[in-house]
Amino acid sequence: MSGFDDLGIYYSDSFGGEQPVGDDGQAKKSQLKKRFREFLRQYRVGTDRTGFTFKYRDELKRHYNLGEYWIEVEMEDLASFDEDLADYLYKQPTEHLQLLEEAAQEVADEVTRPRPAGEETIQEIQVMLRSDANPANIRNLKSEQMSHLVKIPGIIIAATAVRAKATKISIQCRSCRNTIGNIAVRPGLEGYAMPRKCNTEQAGRPKCPLDPYFIIPDKCKCVDFQTLKLQESPDAVPHGELPRHMQLYCDRYLCDKVVPGNRVTIMGIYSIQKSGKTSTKGRDRVGVGIRSSYIRVVGIQVDTEGTGRSAAGTITPQEEEEFRRLAVKPDIYETVAKSIAPSIYGSTDIKKAIACLLFGGSRKRLPDGLTRRGDVNLLMLGDPGTAKSQLLKFVERCSPIGVYTSGKGSSAAGLTASVMRDPVSRNFIMEGGAMVLADGGVVCIDEFDKMREDDRVAIHEAMEQQTISIAKAGITTTLNSRCSVLAAANSVYGRWDDTKGEENIDFMPTILSRFDMIFIVKDEHNEQRDMTLAKHVMNVHLSARTQSSSVEGEVDLNTLKKFIAYCRAKCGPRLSAEAAEKLKNRYILMRSGARDHERETEKRSSIPITVRQLEAVVRISESLGKMKLQPFVTETDVEEALRLFQVSTLDAAMSGSLSGVEGFSTQEDQEMLSRIEKQLKRRFAIGSQVSEHSIIQDFLKQKYPEHAIHKVLNLMMRRGEIHHRLQRKVLYRLK
């Protein structure tokens, strides 16, 4: 009998459906249902002058005729009609929502008459709730709010497949075949406890055994349901803590409304379920009263187009006026750039480029259904100690949606999406990674060069197509990842070596071409600059505690964050005809200049100027226009975008760091490399070792250029054919 005790005590008359209600309780229920019915039938919007419309009556009729058996009720409308009704619904939503749905069914019956033949039976109506009240946080939900209506924002990180749940069941006794039908099952994740005994008394036959009942599937009434996993918003997570999760239960028309990665605000009933079977051992009996919480969803609002946690929706008219005044200032571009990481000295062009990344260009949907990304991707390469990681940390805090991750601790699944087993249903479910959770914002990836090549390849699609396609464990789907990527990396040798050219960087051109701007950050030795920098750092340390207000000409962090969210939501500038003409002419000049350079040097350039670079300049121009809330991009914006592109990607390309995979583009160069490699392999067999200095000296005597010898050695090391030993003095051949 120990198992019986663990499951709680149930009475044999529990199959009678709901608990019997006294006359007073029944009368009160009827009275409340009547008031709900009056609300749905009589609530109207409009004035005497413009005329009234019956909001919910008309909506019920329209939805019912379209075959959509649901209606969305605003809690503010209910409160303005009858304050007590709204209070009942907030404090005891489980029973009163049922009354509201019954009232909606009766009103739908009235407004849809006469119905066609065969449709005489009125369908059940699902009522969804919506409220403009301030949302709470997952970590603020306490036991006092149990069984109350709550409003919670967050990100959907996992969704199960849609399954069926019985709302009314029929059971039959195995022994005497006695059937009990139409037993109501409570909504949510609560199950139904089968009666232990059959009470049917028949003379002359033995008594029915214990646990005789089984469910008749054909006579059950079922609805669709789906469970979701909600994670709290990143900006609501205290520093150093893990984000909290909450299980959600959706049924009927609320199923399949969201996918992992969606930012949502849900209205639901804070409920509890039994937290699994407790152990039969005595020491675990203390957990008999413990229940795990979940939210039974009664309304979902999805933040569309990932504009940044609906930040624009919470902006007051006074703030909007302030933002419009800010946008028309002639020096807004410099002001925003100055406000980005003000504690970091210099790096003006990088800060301006980060400002463009935060505002982003305009996403375009073409007539054939394809899209062109509007987000700007930025890569910072260079020396340690140049505040790359500090800039990344600031952007994570400043962006409306920001996710920070480090390359060494990030896997392909963690960045894109993973498929795992649901511990309850044992079905496969999908969980979105960093780039899915940052949909509509910025992903900051530090130590980009420390990532494994396989993991780095996983974000190719996310960076250009802005989607993540999954085909594993029987799940084939596409998730949105409409986010900018801000990455920071060190060079291969730790510090940037100008003599090494493209050997400083170990990235494939496939990933480099996806970055709109690539900055090489060098720690240059300049006495005047070092003096100014040291003075700035000392000032930051001395005034770290005292300085609270923002410096003149800067925007404080919260205002900047709201301004970025407002501009992203309200403005999507396009190129003006003059700006497009100017950009076209400059692109043709860049292409012809590259062609002339190839003709003069009789060598094909390894730095291509392609359409992808042209689109990058367009995106930068649009972000400059968005900063000023302009509908069209001007020639001045195009000039500045071309200047930024020149000081970043083109300068990096001219330094030789973005050349092809081999770095040698002519046929003669390739033949020379293969000759050096063949001679090198002949020099020492597999498993032997030789001094690197002597190898280089031998090849130099044969008049081979030193950079070509180093290139071959680096290539062979990358392929795992040789590696260094004895403090990089000796080469050892592996294969």
From Swiss-Prot:
The keyword Ligase does not apply. It catalyses: ATP + H2O = ADP + phosphate + H(+). ADP binds at R372. It is an enzyme of class 3 (hydrolase). A motif (Arginine finger) lies at residues 513-516. Gene3D superfamilies: 2.20.28.10, mini-chromosome maintenance (MCM) complex, chain A, domain 1, Nucleic acid-binding proteins, P-loop containing nucleotide triphosphate hydrolases. Signal peptide: none annotated. Keywords: ATP-binding, Cell cycle, Chromosome, DNA replication, DNA-binding, Helicase, Hydrolase, Nucleotide-binding, Nucleus. It comes from the Eukaryota. It is found in: Nucleus; Chromosome. Its EC number is 3.6.4.12. Belongs to the MCM family. Component of the mcm2-7 complex (RLF-M). The complex forms a toroidal hexameric ring with the proposed subunit order mcm2-mcm6-mcm4-mcm7-mcm3-mcm5. The heterodimer of mmcm3/mcm5 interacts with mcm4, mmcm6, mcm7 and weakly with mcm2. Component of the CMG helicase complex, composed of the mcm2-7 complex, the GINS complex and cdc45. This is DNA replication licensing factor mcm5-B. It comes from Xenopus laevis.
